[in-house]
Each structure stands twice: as C-alpha cells, then as structure tokens.
Amino acid sequence: MTKQKPVVIGVAGGSGSGKTSVTRSICQRFTETSILVIEQDYYYKDQSHLPFEERLNTNYDHPLAFDNDLLIEHLQQLMHNEPIEKPVYDYKIHTRSKDVIHVEPKEVIIVEGILILEDPRLVDLMDIKVYVDTDADLRIIRRLMRDIKERGRTLDSVIDQYIQNVRPSHLQFIEPTKRYADIIIPEGGQNHVAIDIMASKIEKILSRGL
C-alpha cells in the first residue's frame, strides 16, 4: 500500500479513439505494483429497477449514464490510500452486475473514459489530463469491431446506436472537453513521443512526493 498521495491521470477521448492503447502504453512504463487503471465504463448507473426493454434504449455516451458520484467517492478513497470495491457493468443485461472487484490503492491511478473531463469534480482530482484525438472514421471502425466481437452486438444495432447516440453525444459532450486537457494526443497509442512525455511527467511527480 502506498503512503504518499497517488498521481491521478485522466485519459479521455471519443469511443474508439485509442484511450485503452494510450493507457496500456503508460502502464508498460511502470511496474504492475505501482499503477492502477479505473475505467469509467465500470461506473454506468445501476438500471436493475428498469424493465429490460427500457435498458436497451440507454445512451451510454451521455453524461447522465454514469454514476460519477460513486466514481468520485472511490477515487477519493484511493487517494487517501483506502481500498475500494469497484462495480462491474454487464452489457448483456444492460445494468450493473452483482459482482465487485476489490482494488487496492497504488502510486499511479489512471482514470479512463469518454466523459471523465466533462465533470468538473473529476477534473479537479486529476494531476494530468489527457485527451486522445482520433478521426471519426477510425473511431467508428474500432467501435464496430469491439462491440461485435466483445459485446455480442449485431452490425445493424451498432450502426443505429452510432447514428442515434454516439455521434451526437460526441459532438455535444465529448469533443468540447478537449479544452480541459493538458495534453492532446493524436494517433492514440501510436504516438510514442506523447507517451514518453507523459511517463517523464509522472516520474517527476512521483519523485517529488506530490
């Protein structure tokens, strides 16, 4: 368990922008015992009280879909070197699972998600704020591949969701948060120069004991 205040890094960007690749690249620069990733996707609101048909209409790209109160509470606990029980979201039933994941605090905490820079309360907790900027055509291709392969979605359903929710929400809520980023990374995890700069900054913060 770490004693000093952890370094909190926010990695934002549109769906399919390469946030996970950036996060993975950063993690490779540090030991597993020193870095922790908290995905905003785990903090979608519990919808177990709603009929399944209503859950199907959830706009997962809207700020109101997230339980930021719980995410903030958990981040504050980790920053005070306290463990948390991280929720698990089940996309097949469109609500929170009964399972939780026990998470211990570490020196570096990466918070990754499409809308982590949208909530000022989250932004205030971050030492470094990153926005991964990727062209829309590449983002939709990546989302298609992910949702069909990993979430059992059909091609038609993914395209319909993109037109109805993903694209409008990106333009209205996600893209504008770029202005709050300290670092904007084009080309995602392939931008090794940006990754090197971030890793150096993290190391400097850790060495100062901030």
Curated annotation (Swiss-Prot):
Predominant location category: cytoplasm
GO molecular function: ATP binding; cytidine kinase activity; uridine kinase activity
Keyword DNA repair attributed: no
Source organism superkingdom: Bacteria
Binding site for ATP: 13-20
EC nos: 2.7.1.48
CDD domains associated with the record: UMPK
Pathway it works in: Pyrimidine metabolism; CTP biosynthesis via salvage pathway; CTP from cytidine: step 1/3; Pyrimidine metabolism; UMP biosynthesis via salvage pathway; UMP from uridine: step 1/1
Pfam families the UniProt entry points to: PRK
Key words, A-Z: ATP-binding, Cytoplasm, Kinase, Nucleotide-binding, Transferase
Compartments where located: Cytoplasm
Catalytic activity as recorded in UniProt: uridine + ATP = UMP + ADP + H(+); cytidine + ATP = CMP + ADP + H(+)
InterPro entries: P-loop_NTPase (IPR027417), PRK/URK (IPR006083), Uridine_kinase (IPR026008), Uridine_kinase-like (IPR000764)
One GO CC annotation: cytoplasm
Gene Ontology biological process: CTP salvage; UMP salvage
Family (UniProt): Belongs to the uridine kinase family.
Name recorded for this polypeptide: Uridine kinase
